[in-house]
Amino acid sequence: MKNYQAEIVAVGTELLLGQIANTNAQWLSEKLATYGINMYNHTVVGDNLERVEQAFQLAQSRSNIIIVTGGLGPTADDLTREGFQQMTGLPLVEDKESMEKIEGFFQNRGRTMTPNNRKQARVFEGSTVLNNKAGMAPGMYVHYQSCHWFFLPGVPREMKHISQEELFPFLEKVTGKQRIIQSVVLKFIGIGESTLEHTLSDLIEKQTNPTIAPLAQDQAVVIRLTARGETKQEAEAMLEQTKKLILARVGEHYFGENEESIEDIVVQQLQDLGYSISAAESITGGMFSQRLVSVTGASNVFAGSFITYQSRIKEEVLEVPSEIIHSQGVVSRACSDAMASNVTRKIQTNLGISFTGIAGPDEQEGKPVGTVYISIADGDEVVVSKQFNFTGNRNHIRDRACLKGFELIYQYLKSKS
């Protein structure tokens, strides 16, 4: 079985300037992995003929499947064809069917076609034209010096259409049967990346197949498991075996997989238990509620919230006793507990969660920036009451408080199920 090494070359100065994200490469890499094709390199090059040619030469020297996205349009800075022609000397010819399609596009809309649009119908002599039903510029396949070159439009909608209709079936014919690659992302909360890696260090050091890759994300610590097998079932069985070994050590921090978020899981937990929840937010200013309602089905479990930012509103709306506010302050365990209890009672939910704290830039009530209190009430009883000292800028502290709130609810509901 031949070992194929794939590379994506994305052409476009707008990618280098950060004006748009290279989502094409992410999507293609994910899809190609399911075909057992190893993606070794991503290259981004601007709209400069010499640099485009250099990028192509480098790709030719180290890869045998090369997918080029972008640079197939009608303008002078669309230089993919020219760069490849300069490297290979292959002549460009006009594809009759593509040209008729482009002419028909303008005729049907009563518009005059400018001469530069003919450029979009030019393909390399002897190439296989990849039909673009979602746009005008066709894709191309060229076999050059033992390398398989695929040229696709840069517009994501067109690139995906050609890939699904033409590229992937063509690749299967070109490469034959490859070993299947399957991946799963395990998500953890309440544990740092370094602690997680240390706990699993012997498994990571011995990894071969599946591979184990710890990663840090904004809202979770994740482990990506990747297995390679002769069949999908074989690869999935290897993933499941390794997953069991990992969860035997850090299962208490595990909450979900792949695209699942902590708020997705919390909503599901609430639904499974038949619980409703409300929120009283001060430091988070509605962030918790916003994240919760982003989940489909949240209306079944989330009744509403109060954003009580000022002390007066905490006292008037949430009925936090004035003696607590004046003696212990609004950034206190007593205030947080009262907020959680009272929002539960006022909105009439099973659970209530509260957030109060100091996001900065200045300290408050003699307490440092980053001081946060989070409480959870279950009916008349405060069941969780925690103090945290977060670091970072204002919004980072608020984000961490919100995430910690989801973690506390998740752990509490987990203990109830």
From Swiss-Prot:
SUPFAM superfamilies: CinA-like, Molybdenum cofactor biosynthesis proteins. Coiled coil: none annotated. It comes from the Bacteria. Gene3D superfamilies: 3.30.70.2860, CinA-like, MoaB/Mog-like domain. It holds the Pfam family CinA_KH. PANTHER family: NICOTINAMIDE-NUCLEOTIDE AMIDOHYDROLASE PNCC, NMN AMIDOHYDROLASE-LIKE PROTEIN YFAY. Belongs to the CinA family. This is Putative competence-damage inducible protein. It comes from Oceanobacillus iheyensis (strain DSM 14371 / CIP 107618 / JCM 11309 / KCTC 3954 / HTE831).
